[in-house]
Amino acid sequence: MRARNFNIDSLAVSKTDREDTSRMTITLHGDDVAVEQAAKQLYRLIDVLKVQDVTSDPTVEHELAFVKIRATDSNRDEVLRLVELSRGRVVDLADGSVIVEVTGTESEIDTFVSLVRTYGIKELVRTGAVVMARGSGSIEEAIKR
């Protein structure tokens, strides 16, 4: 993809309900021509079953982030309040830091990261977006067409 000047913003790969199939969610920005070219490049790969452009479709989209935040005795309560307000979850609490799991859209996670940046981010990792089209249809049905 990079050789064709497509910059991938996020990439998520996972198992599906089919043992022999994995699903990739690739997020990239570009005009309609660029998106179409990216789809054509993906179809040239071995064993690509379906490329689905959901740019203009109603979708559910989330990503996950783990954020290790510097947390001292003096600011720990403030940090934990921000976690609660952001619907995050504390997954590790240690002397001097707290690891938080946050899920949401890219902008929701960006907002949380901005809010806690003033306390000091010791480490940050994000999954990239996973996306599913809303409604009763499925990618499996699209593959069979």
Residue ranges and their predicted role:
Residues 1-145:
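A conserved regulatory-domain signal marking ACT and ACT-like small-molecule sensing domains
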